[in-house]
């Protein structure tokens, strides 16, 4: 994977009530990371890092179109292009190792200090794909994935990752013993990055990449996972249910906590019920199984 000639930084002033939803939206647009610069008087200043120049002012209009109920301050305060040689420097302070759950640890590829020996390390480098473990929805998805796998009497043989992004969820599954990861994404730029991250972690033999979303996959798996926003999850409900093998588990993250009911109602039509959930900072992840299997 080649590095971009420049990367872009955008700073937004966001009403505190919108901050989590806006951050999740930014990751869906392809930011490699976000950090809070300042919090005061009910507002946050958020800096976003991108590997390709974007028309950031258009994001705000798109956000309000997708979330008409989201009311509050949202302004682009500053944006600039930075030379690629500063890319890694800009990330050193922001993207630090983070422990997730009981066994996982996400670390940037350049990190040189000693890491805990009792953790399964997933090495990543910033890219255009969503998923570095820095956003709470990714962290919750990883925690739920770990919980489900560790509770099984036997490690499931395969997993389908819908909307794979950086491949971080599939990588975690491979680290936890799953031998076949089918990863799909409708952005063709993303799959080479996910494949690169699998190779970086010596897990390339476990990766099967598919361009497109859930509808293009014609097999099932005992474990299916998707970290997407509610609208995307709801549009994929039929296929998410279809891909989940009989007796299997579907994990969904990327939801605000109050969005549980719409997704649960949609999946209940296919016999899937919530069997586990986890929540942090206003976001939630859920595991679904057939009624009677929990």
Annotate each PLM feature.
Residues 4-116:
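N-terminal auxiliary segments of SAM/dcSAM-dependent transferases
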Residues 9, 13, 105, 123-125, ...:
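Conserved beta-strand segments that form the floor/walls of ligand-binding pockets within enzyme
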Residues 85-153:
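SAM-dependent Rossmann-like transferase core, predominantly class I methyltransferases
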Residues 128, 132-217:
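Conserved SAM/SAH cofactor-binding pocket of Class I
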Residues 186-294:
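S-adenosylmethionine
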